[in-house]
């Protein structure tokens, strides 16, 4: 993903940190977006780094303990973008955004757990009777962390993890519509990625079938969770099939590791702001 003014300074760093920051990555028709004053209440947002997508300098300050709030941690606070797709959707719906998403979040792997985000939302009363929407987008980090396990087992374990979390959310936000938001298209769908965009519409094409495998697995994990919990799945794949990391500059929403042509964004190898704005509209209309 792109970075703003600091991107040229961190280009050399991007390749080494991209895999660890890969936190990754559907469209449901719905009513027209109401005006900002049409609804009262809030939206609660849970997810990994593709949701949180904090500015790189804020992410680094949190990791290094240089923020006034101290070191970031999924149990206390996490830096997030003011313009990620969840907040974009909340603004379009006239809802206050309570964003608990955090980079690196996992469910069935070792690491910062989604349950900790739910704990924070309950403890801070972000989840309440006035909550109208709850967005959940997580799971990609669990795909590569469970690489080699049968996909059916990973999907089963993910559903078993998510069921009690959804039950907790429902108990504290009984009036909310809960939505599992799928990941957008990352690879070209044929097992290729484009990591280095070195000139206008000039890039490599690198076979990396694992990315396609992982994004497809993450998609089905979220579909399964929505079905098992009686919640809604928002499918972003159809709406972003032409916006993957090998797409032309004017369409690309998932940038390469080095990419100065897809448009502005925050974290390397994560969604562009254009992508957040686009997906935010889809979620708001869903």
Regions found by a protein language model. Give the residues of each.
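Short amphipathic alpha-helices and their capping/turn segments at secondary-structure boundaries
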Residues: 33-45, 114-130, 163-175, 284
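Short glycine-rich His-centered loop
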Residues: 39-80
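Structural recognition of the beta-strand scaffold that forms the well-ordered cores
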Residues: 42-53, 96-101, 108, 132-137, ...
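A short acidic, glycine-rich active-site loop
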Residues: 65-83, 154-157, 202-216, 268
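Catalytic His-Asp segment of secreted/periplasmic serine-dependent ester chemistry enzymes
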Residues: 186-286
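Conserved SGNH/GDSL esterase-like catalytic core that processes O-acyl groups on lipids
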Residues: 63-153
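Secretory targeting and sorting signals
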Residues: 1-37
């Amino acid at each position: 993903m792109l970075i703003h003014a600091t991107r040229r300074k961190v280009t050399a760093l991007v390749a080494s940190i991209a895999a660890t920051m890969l936190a990754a990555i559907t469209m449901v028709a719905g009513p027209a977006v109401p005006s900002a004053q049409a609804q009262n209440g809030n939206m609660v947002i849970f997810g990994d780094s593709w949701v949180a997508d904090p500015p790189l300098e804020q992410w680094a300050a949190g990791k290094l303990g240089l923020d006034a709030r101290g070191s970031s941690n999924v149990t206390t606070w996490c830096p997030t973008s003011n313009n990620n797709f969840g907040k974009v959707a909340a603004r379009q719906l006239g809802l206050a955004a309570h964003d608990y998403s955090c980079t690196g979040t996992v469910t069935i792997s070792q690491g910062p757990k989604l349950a900790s985000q739910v704990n924070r939302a309950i403890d801070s009363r972000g989840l309440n009777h006035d909550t109208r929407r709850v967005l959940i987008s997580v799971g990609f980090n669990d795909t590569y962390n469970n690489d080699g396990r049968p996909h059916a087992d990973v999907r089963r374990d993910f559903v078993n993890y998510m069921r009690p979390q959804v039950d907790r959310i429902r108990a504290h936000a009984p009036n909310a519509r809960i939505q599992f938001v799928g990941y957008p298209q990352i690879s070209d769908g044929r097992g290729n990625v484009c990591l280095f965009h070195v000139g206008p519409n000039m890039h490599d094409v690198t076979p990396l079938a694992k990315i396609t495998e992982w994004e497809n697995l993450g998609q089905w994990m979220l579909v399964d969770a929505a079905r098992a919990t009686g919640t809604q799945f928002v499918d972003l794949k159809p709406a972003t099939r032409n916006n993957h990391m090998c797409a032309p500059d004017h369409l690309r929403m998932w940038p390469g590791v080095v990419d100065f042509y897809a448009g502005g964004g925050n974290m390397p190898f994560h969604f562009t702001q254009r992508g957040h704005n686009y997906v935010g509209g889809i979620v708001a209309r869903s």
